[in-house]
Amino acid sequence: MISANDPKALCDSINAARDAGTKVVTFDSDTDPSCRDLFINQATAEGIAQVQVDMIADQIGDSGEVAILSAAANATNQNAWIDMMKETLAADHPDIELVDVVYGDDDDQKSFDATAALLADHPNLKGIISPTTVGIAAAARYLSTSDAKGKVALTGLGTPNQMRDYVEDGTVTEFALWNPGDLGYLAAFAAKALVDGDITGEEGDTFTAGDLGDFEVGADATVLLGDPFKFNADNIGDFNF
């Protein structure tokens, strides 16, 4: 089981393993579909993009300049989400202007510095979307001690444990994520189903993933975990991951 930061870079190694009889399951961030047997998708690109756009629109009054702080420029999942966010903003939020997309390479300090640069380069910035757990935490850390705290909204994808302090101190109002434990749990059951021969990765194959219930393989040998979940001051204390 692997999560890929580049859709092509691992394909030669993966295909060598598959030729030797190894079943390959990707999760979180996919390779090219031809390089693996199954992809466990935490949510659809459309769903992840939509929830982040909805949150930032709500937090900035559906008007003003926003920017995106992403991970690596070639990260498969990030780019899919960003493309969908651009489409959703253009179609449904004409008064929101996406002024920049920057990359922190999932490095805390680089993401922290990129946040500072965004605020310096765009003095009228009203919001930042960071669809990466490293990026959103670094951006929150910067905003929490800056004059922009409470003035520039921050949302995206994060974990409750890393974001709890920033929600409680008012730096962040709301963010989203799937349950990573459930994602790994589903990936493990899917891999076992492949190895046992219960499924082949064909569209329409079904299997049971323990306490999560039954799942069906969709197009491009993809299995969908579900919809993203929003975390805020009302519920963040209920989670510990």
Where are these regions (language model features)?
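Short beta-strand elements in bilobed, periplasmic/extracellular small-molecule ligand-binding domains
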Residues: 35, 65-68, 90-108
